[in-house]
Amino acid sequence: MMTTYLMRCFFRASTFILCFLLLSCTVKAQQKLNVAIAGLTHDHVYLIMNSYQKAEVNIIGIAESNPELVERFKNRYKIPDSLFYNNLPDLLKKKKPDVVLAYNAISGHLAVVEAAAPLGISVMVEKPLAITVKQAERMAELAAQYKVHILTNYETTWYPSNQELYKEVKESNTIGALCKIIVHDGHQGPKEIGVSAEFLSWLTDPNQNGAGALVDFGCYGANLMTWLMDGKTPISVSAITHQIKKDVYPNVDDDATILLEYPSATGIIEASWNWPFSIKDMEVFGANGYMQAVNDKTLRLKNNGKDDYKIYQAKTSKPIYSNHLSYLSAVLKGEINPANDLSSLSNNLIVVKILAAAKKSAQTGKKVILK
């Protein structure tokens, strides 16, 4: 009798545990984003593909017209034919994703928003938002009209070092009032580091990318400075550009220096395809000290009266700020308001204005006043 009773208890407990595990797996699966991909020509697409391989995201459709690219991705990631469409409108007639992720040329971002927004589908594009102010403002109009999110993804948004620097400077007032921000972003050059031919073709086309290093890397500094300056537009923008490797990049700049004027601070953006190694860092000077986000994890701090720098590792970011998928999920669920975040539409409208003014300044040799 006792043995039978124990067996029944064990069976019931096992059944309960099994049901619980199945339910947990189902909930977890439901929490994964269902995404559609617009374009495969931006090499950052490999990040989402890696997430797909790890079962961190559901890709329910891919819009790409280049048959060679389609075949390449189909074979490499074992993606079924049924997920591929020749264009985004056709895809969205058949599928209803949570969000569209754009991995196409910057000049094509507006078309992605025009296809998705009227259907109530939010969009995240790779940096920057657009190549012209007119395009960016049209995207903002569509976002407001159809009540969708238009977000921009930057690698540096998910750096724990940048997140911690912001908290120290803006919330803890560790170095006092900001007076200067310097941001360096660059590498040896896209061709030199071996980006794909499809990516290189539009990255070095001023009609598709807007410029060269000025846009490709200048956008990072404009994004971070707008964030640190509380979403304020700079008073003026000045810039100089160079074509150091004219034989490699004949149609666009490969080095840019951009100066942003604020009422009580100066921003300096250094962007290049000519550096001996890859770098993404940020320095901030305050009334009482200095901080540097040396890379994605390391910080450097020095206060007045101190002889040595304090060098330390940033704390791990909150889960929703650890990567673009977690952030997107939180935004779409209404768990956070992206109003002034690095990915926000308001921030990135200003970024596009800064880049447009920088191009004009470099062309004319004059300071451009922003209204």
Named regions from a protein language model:
Residues 1-30:
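Bacterial Sec-dependent N-terminal signal peptides
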Residues 25-77:
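N-terminal Rossmann-like dinucleotide-binding module
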Residues 37, 125, 150-152, 293:
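Hydrophobic residues in well-ordered beta-strands that form the structural core
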Residues 69, 77-142:
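Beta-loop-alpha module in the N-terminal Rossmann-like domain of NAD(P)-dependent dehydrogenases
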Residues 159-240, 244-248, 365:
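Predominantly a Rossmann-like dinucleotide-binding segment in NAD(P)-dependent oxidoreductases
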